[in-house]
Structure formats: structure tokens, C-alpha cells
Amino acid sequence: MSDSDLPVQVKKEPSFANDDDLTFDEEFRRAGDQENKEVENPDDGRSLKRTREESEQEENNEKEQDQEAGQDEEEQDEDEEEEEDDEEEDEEDEVSSRRKRRRGANQFFDIEAEVDDEEEDEEDEDEEAELMREEFITDDHAPVETVEKMPQDDRLHRQYDNRRQQAEDQDAEQLAETLKQRYRKTHSVYRGETAASGTVSQKLLMPSINDPSIYAIRCTPGREKELVRKLYEKKRTLERQGNPLDILTVFQRDAFTGYIYIEAKRPDAIDKALVGMVNVFVRDKLLVPVKEYPDLLKQVKSSDVEIRPGIYVRIKRGIYRGDLAIVDNLSENGLDVRCQVVPRLDYGQNDEIGPDGKVIKSKIKPLPALFSEQKARMYDPYKLQMGRVPNSFIYRGNEYYDGYLYKDFKLQFIQTKDVNPTLEELDRFQNQNDEDGLNLQAIAATLKGNNAGEGKSSTAFQPGDKVEIRRGEQAKTIGIVVETALNEITIKVTDSGDPRFVDQRLTVPANDLRKIFYEGDHVRIVEGKHFDETGLVIKIDGDSVVIVSDQTKEDVRVFANYLVKATDASSNFDLLNSKYDIKDLVELSGLTVGVIIKAEKNIFDVLTTDGRLISVRQSGIASKLKQSRREQVATDRNGTTIRVGDTVKELLGEKSREGAILHIYKNALFIKSNEIVENLGIFVANRMNVTTVATKDSTVSKSLGPDLTSMNPNLRLPNPVAVAGLKTRVGGRDKLLYKDVAVTSGSYKGLKGKVTEADDLYARIELHTKSKKIKVLKNNLNVIVHGQPVPYLRFIGAAPEFSQPTPPTYGSSSGGRSAWNGGMTPSVSAGNGGVSAWGGSRGGFGGDGGKTPAYGAGGASTWGGASAWGGGAGGSSAWGGIKGAGSVWDRSKGGSSASSGNQGGNTAWDRNKGGNSTWDRSKGGSSSWESGSTWEGGNNTTWGSKKGNTSAWGRN
């Protein structure tokens, strides 16, 4: 061991008189250093001694300066702050000088803190401790210049460590903001315009001519995905064999059927990759232009439904083409799908044997039905085998379990879009599904793909619906739908865990939302098996809701998103696709007829003619009754004609219901009332129990009594003075309505039409010749009756106007009689003193002369003393100038008839006395067609004249 390795023996020396500021350890350390240097180099010791003396002298000088400074402080208070600063600087210089002097003495010493009884400043202690930590280990062998620079290096390291510790303790968001502010300028300069826009121009992403090219290769439609998988497997296999293909990418696009796309640097690499591949046409290669790359490679959300067990699909090929199936499993290569199908079997019943003895299968497509073991054993037992598990069979090479066929189909023969299962198809799979008979999750997965392909939402969210976010960062957030767009729903937050989101709008995918309902809400089902049914919510179970159906009164479990709030119990039946509508008159059987008052999905509520309300299916309705206008006519209890649209009132016991007639079927009236709530306000009444309140075209007073016009025809004759304003609406409907008429005067003279409206003076006519309606005075119309025109006044039973001459049709009697005959009601009775028109007994309405209701008494005419058509006593006729009772057409005296020259009360066609027959010639009276002929003499008729009874046309 060398001397340098031995520990140095240090002896304690007494401290110098001026070393008051040095501690014992420092003095001990300085003494040891001095002895070592004296042994090695005495000159250095002397120099060290001189250096120590110089330092002591400097310290004494400093003390003297401090004393002087203290005296100056007492004398000059103004410079106190400056002197304190000087003292601090001097102390720092003194400490630094001490540090330099004892830099190399602590290499082999353990420095311990000394307990000082004196009270010192906390700042001094902290500073001393910091210095001790810095000087604990130093490099004594380093050069002096290096030793002098080390404090500065240590300070830099400490500053770096402090900054790093602060950065670690800093919050992540604050640190990100700091970095963003620090490097914002350089970031913007580097990115250029893209920093502001946030997007990169499509042209910057375009490949160059040095990049690989993309080729489109034509293939068999429907085989695109299969070819892509095969090329991928081929590339992996050849890579393992050390002969890799030079193609980079293989893909296909759903939007471009019949093509696959391969990315390669050379076309010959594509030819090599496609060697031995089927369903692909290698010669039909197309180089895709560079400008079409963005459209070709643009990411588009696939509309394909993920094929997984349980979803509904349809078969594209074979005997099961178009049939609904359920995916049971997938093959390992992903090219085959095992499906569950309802089998179509005839068990060989329709098979035929050909000339060669082979069985020819029938081309008739059997109906879908579950597999029947009994039929298979009965008709085709040799091809039936028992399966490996209970209730399974193998028939003709196919496996059947629980009556369903389980068969493998190629992936390209499976249709996953636009499946849309019907209710009848879903019922066939009811045996194995849940309590509702449907696999709701499978239907939801199927509908999700269908609606996504069409750009529609899979659920019916409407503005105002209350929803809850099911998953994501905002889960459990409740809001109200304010806007819907495709599969994105905008909601207004009403309740959230973070108050900052309240009243804010969020856009959420429709699949992440769930509708909120409460017990007691009345809802309608908009999707699923129970579509369009209504019910009352009785239970909420997660995403599903249990309701009581209004139609079946049974519990139904459906998804909450399949419901909407309903205001009524009736369903929105698809009337556009139905043969029957509400309020239609239908026939259920030969004896039952009724009106539809409610239409459900498959059930109609019908109110029958006997007042019963029955529910029938659409198949239970025989036909819809289409009655003509003529058939829907009846009479009420007063004999007034009633039609569809008239307002009637039922008078039966205490009932007093009123309404408009909706349908008329025989004696039953279906009446719609605004005062009744049940059955849409429709009730049934018998026609004999109602009275007319108002017709469709006019109003009848409710205080009308019995219809006297039907009892006494005499009341139909109006006052001649009031003929111009004659009212024809006696007892309800205007008699002229819906009659064919002809115009007799005016600019429309000769035109014919049908009366559609009428008032007291005018009638509105719809012309037959052209589609036009005209307004004409009723007096200018002729009514067409049995093909013959009848003047309007005669049609309504009124007398003709007196300003116009009208020749008599038959004859007249003596004075004091009516216009047609004495003592007789017009056109009813005739004869002398109430004799019937045909002779004999009295008429029911006849009487003596002067008793006609519409005219004056005493035999005097309205215009004179004589009758209008005959010559009575006491005055001349209106058309005759003969004194006495001369007839208009006759000049004989007395009461001769207009058509005869006989006396007294002879009939129009007879000249005998008394009530002789018209065709009798007894008692000197000749018949109208006998001895008194028109061209003969004697007691002649109207066309002959003799002995005073001269005819108007002859003078024989």
C-alpha cells in the first residue's frame, strides 16, 4: 500500500484569533490541508501561510468597514437600504471565497451537521444546507478551472430537473394547450393552407405514374367476393412456397357488379395470378384511369347485412326460391350457409314413371308445410331414415329436425337485403321462437340492413318523442327529439349527469336511442307482428314494453322503439288496399246487411239492419252493395218521400233521435247523428218510425201536421189569383225535382233537360245536349210524362191561366155548374145533381150546382153569368155574344151542351133525359156517334147543326 493510500493523521491546532466565523470542522480541515502541503512542499506551506495571513487581514478590514458602515447607518438613515444591499453582496462574495478555499479537502471526510446553540436565521441555515449538499462529493483531482465551473453546471442540472418535474406534475390539458401555443407558429408555417382548412386536397393524394396501376377484370356477377377470397388464399399459399405473386391488392365494390379490381405494377403479374381461376375473364382487363381512383376507393358504408346465425334471409335458387329462411350456421370458409327452411314436400305422390322405368319428379311446386313422418312412411318409406338425435329424420338425403329442413346453400344463393318477412311466413317459425311467436332480434337485424340500404331509419322517431341514449359517452342522457335526418336524430337534452349539457342539442345515431314510455300510456305498434295494434302500457322491461292490446285484450311484448303514442283505439287500417271502406253498405249473407263502422287490421265491425253490432273478417263479407238512386227511396210514416241525405227524426217511445239518412235498405234506414258518440253516430231505424224534418234540397217545418194533400185532392187547387206565386213544395220535396222537362219559351226554347234545383218561381235545369245549367221560370216548362209533354200547371194540378182560350176536351153542362160539368168535382164526377161521370149513383165528391170549391157559387162564371164553357142562365159567355145562356160553341138557348143540342142534364155523349148511358139511343136521344153525326142533320153533335142547335163548324 502506498503512502498516498494511507489515511492522513490530522492534529488539532488552536484556532486563529481572527477565525471567529469558522466552525471547528472547518478549522480542522484547513489545518490538515496545511500540514499535507508543508510536508510535500515547504514553499507551498509558506505561501499558504502568507495567503492565510492575507485572508485574515482582509477579514479584519471587512470588520472595520462593517463598523464604519454601522456608524454611518446611525448617522445617515437615508442610505440604509443601499448599505444593506452592499452587505448582502459582500456576504455572498465571502461565502464564494470560502467555498473555493475548502473545495478539495472533503474527499475523505464524512461531514456531519454540528449542533449550534446560537440562534441563527432560517435563511442562513437553508443556504448552508444547500451548500453542503452541493459540496458533499467533489472531484479533487479536477483542474482548478474545472472546479471553478462545476457550481454553474450543477445549477443547470438542477434547473433542468426542476422543469422536468414541473412538466410531469402539470395537467394533461394544460400541457397540451402550452405545447399548442408554443409551436403554433411553426406548425402553421409547415402545414401551409391545410392547417387552416383541416383537410387535404384530393389532388395531393393522387398517385403518380410511378405508383402501381389498378386493373378491372370482368367476372361472373355474384362471384366477386368468392374470387377475392380465392386470390387471397392463393397469394398466401404461394408466399409460403417461396413463389409470391406480384399483385398488391385485390378488392371488389358492391356498386360495380361483375368486376374485381387488382392492383399491380405489371399486367403480366395479373395474368399469372389468375391462371387456373374460374368465373373470371382474364382477357377483359381494363386499366382504371387515375382520375377515377377517388371514386373507386371512396369508403362507402356497405348496405350488406352481416350474416350471422338467427337472421332472416331468402333463397334465390331452386324449389325454395323466394322462401323465407333462418340462418343456422356458417361454414368455415364462409362460402356456405346452413339455413332452416319450411320444407316443400309431396312425398312422391305426384311423381311419374317414365318409359325407361325411371321416376320423373313432378314440376309442381308443393305448398310449404312442416315435415310429416306419417306421410313419409305412408308414401315413401324406403327413403326415410332416423336421424342422429331425437325428433330428427333424414329423408331423400336431407336432414329434418322438428319438422324444418336444415340445408346448406351457397352464399351467392342467399338474399340478405329486402327480405321483408310477412306475417304468414313468420307464423311458420312460431314453434321455436319466443312467447310472441317471433324472434324480435332477428327481425331487428334484418330490418336494420334493409332500412340502411334505403337510407331510412330502422325506427320511427318523430319530433316530440322522449328518448334516452343507451350507450356511448352520453349514456343515460334523456332528451326530446327535435329533428330527424336519415339515421341521425337531433335531441334537446332535458336531463343529464353534466348540467352543462342541459338544453343543448346533440346529434345521436338512431341505433343508440331508446324511446321512453310510462305505465298507462296509450301507444300504437308501428313495426313487427302486431303492426298497427293499439294498447295500454302495463310494464317497462329494459328496451321492451308490455302492453294490453285493445283488439285482442292480450299481453304483447314489443320493443320500445316500435311504439308511438296513440290518441284513439282504432287502428290505421290500410283502406287504400282494401275493398271496403268505413260507412260502406255491405252484404254479409243473403239475409244480413249492414254498414261498416270500424275497420281493424283483419276485422270489421258491422252494424246490421236489426241493430246488432257484429265483428267479421274480410272473408266473411260477401260483397259491397251498390244501390242506384231509384232503389234508395222510401216513405216516412206520413207518406212523404225520403231519400239519402234527408234529415229525419225517429219517433219511437221515449227515443227522439235525429240525423241525416246515410243508407236506405228496404224498410231500414241507417241514420248518421251528430248527437250520438257510439258507432260513429250511426243508428238504425224503421222507415215507419221516422218523420221528415228537412229534405236534402229544402227545409220542412217541424210543426207540420198530417199530409192533407194525400187525403183531399181538392186542396191541391190553388186560388187563381195566386197562380203566379204558386208554391209547389207541399209536404216536403218539390214535385219538379229530377224530372225531365222541355223549355217552351225564351232563348232556350225547345231544349230538354233535368231539373236539379227548384224554388217557388224558378227551376235550374241541367241540359241534355251540353253540360250546362240554366235557370227558367217554371211556367215556361213542359214536364215529360210517359213521353208526352204536360204543362207545368197541369202537372202540379192547378187550373190553366184564364187569359188564354182552351177548348173543352169532352163537354159542359148547363149553367151553375163547374168547368167540366154541373155539380161535379173536376175530373172526378160528372152528371146532373151529383150523378157519376158514367151515370148512376152519386160520386164521392160530387154535389149540386154551384158547389165547386175553387169557384163561385150560383152558377155565375168568374167572368160573367154564364159558365166558362157552357151557356147558363143570366149572362153571356166569355166567348159568345148570344143573350141568355148561349154556349161558346153553340147558339141555342137554354143549357145545351157544348157538344150537343139537347136539354137539361144530358151527358156529354148522350141526348136522352136523365142518366142514360153514353152509348144508348133510347128515349129519342141519339148517341154521339149515331144519328147526330158530324156530317148529318137533325139533332146533331158538335160538328152538325139543326133546329137551333147549330154547330160551330156547320150550318146544316
Curated annotation (Swiss-Prot):
- Ranges of biased composition (kind: Acidic residues): 67-94, 111-129
Give the superkingdom in one word.
Eukaryota
Subcellular location, principal: nucleus
Q: Name one GO biological process term.
A: filamentous growth of a unicellular organism
Q: Keyword Nucleus: yes or no? A: yes
Keywords from the named record: mRNA processing, Nucleus, Transcription
Task: Tell me which GO cellular component terms the UniProt record holds.
Answer: DSIF complex; rDNA heterochromatin
| Role according to the record | The SPT4-SPT5 complex mediates both activation and inhibition of transcription elongation, and plays a role in pre-mRNA processing. This complex seems to be important for the stability of the RNA polymerase II elongation machinery on the chromatin template but not for the inherent ability of this machinery to translocate down the gene.
Family to which the UniProt record says this protein belongs? Belongs to the SPT5 family.
Assembly = Component of the SPT4-SPT5 complex. Interacts with RNA polymerase II.
Protein name (Swiss-Prot/TrEMBL): Transcription elongation factor SPT5
The opening ranks of the lineage are: Eukaryota, Fungi, Dikarya, Ascomycota, Saccharomycotina
The primary gene name is: SPT5
